Amino acid sequence: VEMAKIGRPVLIRGNSCNGTGEKIRLYRDTMSGAGFSDQAVEESLNQLWVWREMHISETDDEAFDDFLLAHHSAYSYLEDVRAEWNPPEMEISIQRAPLGKDSYAKTPDPDVSESMVGGYKRVTEQVAMLQDVGVRNLMLTNRGLVSQDKANRSLRLLSEKIMPSFR
């Protein structure tokens, strides 16, 4: 909210698809309420980014099997590093643990904070849902410690099977 009041773009992390849409609307409304022109609001919305974890395979099960355990391992490692190195009096936002496979429904749920993980059809649907709630820019990372081959295959599927749908 404070960044919207001064017209600065932000990076939105985490949240469900619908939660992300709510944050974008709050940002837009706050910026408008602070007296910025419609053009200035649009320019800032064009510079607003949403950060998601991503892993794509041919099928949902393959992606879940490749990524989720590796993502949990990376999460645990980072939590250990934070506990060791962050000063105890330092206030930091607590990172939410990644969802387990059983938390992913057959189709993406816009009210659950899902990573963008699955077969390319599922992830295409997730990108479309984010676009529908106002996301214009996505920063996608692969936090799981998957092999270089699997990461490269995921990126290839992103560029060949998903991105052409959104050009």
Regions found by a protein language model. Name each.
Residues I6, M129-R136, S165-F166:
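A structural motif corresponding to the C-terminal end of an alpha-helix
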Residues V1-R28:
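A conserved active-site cap/scaffold subdomain adjacent to cofactor or substrate pockets
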Residues L155-R167:
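Alpha-helix-loop-beta-strand connector modules within alpha/beta enzyme cores
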Residues G19-V135:
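An alpha-helical appendage that flanks or caps ligand/catalytic pockets
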Residues G14-N15, W85, M139-L155:
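Glycine-rich, proline-tolerant flexible connector loops at the mouths of alpha/beta enzymes
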Residues V1, T20, E58, Q148-D149:
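Short catalytic/ligand-binding loop motif for oxyanion handling, primarily in non-cytosolic enzymes
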Residues R8-R13, N46-E53, L138-N142:
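Hydrophobic faces of well-ordered beta-strands that scaffold small-molecule active sites
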